Amino acid sequence: MAQASSQALPASTPARSPYLVLFVSWLIPGGGHFLLGRRGRGAIIFLAVLVSFAFGLMMRGAMFQPKSGDLLTTLIQYGGFVADLASGLFYLLSVWLGYSQEDMAGHSHDYGAKFLVAAGLLNILAMVDAWEISTGKKD
């Protein structure tokens, strides 16, 4: 008997385009999991990213902007910008509504910036998870 060469999605997972799932996962944290029928996991991801992002805003954390300079400064600024942008709609709404904090000295501001970055990095992990589920590499 010949085995099927392609990996089929489990019966509980609706067939969705992996690119659509990836885009929705970026735009709305946990949204890709909702599309795939994983509502519990999607809600947990949404709340985790939202709480982390909200704490960062409440601590008046500065969002990274792409700036050039020496190699380390450029790497930190662009990496932080990508991580902030990975928060999806939360980042876009905060920028569109005019949130802008200057990078200033202080522990709470520094922690706030780290919470904003952590929210984006957590959403990147969720995007990878949703991608793997939608392509059948993970149950």
Show the residue positions of the predicted features.
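Membrane interfacial helix-start motif at the N-side
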Residues: 9-14, 24-44
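Transmembrane helix recognition focused on a "late"/terminal membrane span
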Residues: 2-22, 45-139
